[in-house]
């Protein structure tokens, strides 16, 4: 059965790295017989240019009907300060598709260890996943600003907490089988609920170890002993901060993919970096995060584990061979990096 994939190239370097990702997917499909079709749609600044809105109605329609969605990058300086901005399209898409779980793998490639701000011995063996709740918590509660007082409401239901923690346990079941639930249980009522639910869900996964960590000590451990983590799960605010902290461990955003999942609809796969308008159109953007996002899609949405691993190993082999784009210390162009990965599939 043909899989329908929507490609949202977006802005800046987005079109260049999207092409790279799709070229790798096409090359892999020729080897493995993966049957798919691509529907390219405007989004972000490109959506504003095409239809006056960062998430055009037709783009949303095809996204709802898709099996998976690939997003490259959004954001353009021409919309800075504008009432309608490209980034609003991503927030709207997350809301419309109920993308409640953000998944961010953090893995340090041996050939790129020197880029990390941490000592090599600190990052040896780092390979963990941050699972962040994306649609609840303080970002989505009431925000009240008065003349001399302000308050923000942090609100979570049992069901919201349960589904994100269950997602983390499902991921851990196929990894090293350790879930670290991060909260502030010694202070916050929402964290007391969070810990209660985590304990309850853990009973359904007897082969997975559950650990609890307060967010402040977790932030410290992510720097002093990041290799201890397997799967981290946490609420929206803590996840926002910790996932950004984790992204600096590799020393570059150019090799880090992410996924956002809903309960029943299509998932969204994207690099964690921005649109880099300063280098757009020059053919020098690092396509690896986009290519690894394609690998995540194959594994998570389509269950094609071997295909995903082929891409990941090809990326690792290309880096080990010294084929590097400028952001990671080399001179390879976007095209050369992509071709090197395809040659090693």
Regions found by a protein language model. Name each.
Residues 49-154, 237:
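N-terminal glycine-rich phosphate/adenylate-binding segment common to multiple enzyme folds
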Residues 21, 25, 198, 290-301, ...:
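Buried hydrophobic packing segments
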Residues 33-57, 222:
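N-terminal beta-loop-helix "entrance" segment that forms/cooperates
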Residues 111, 213-220:
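Short acidic loop-to-helix transition motifs that present clustered carboxylates
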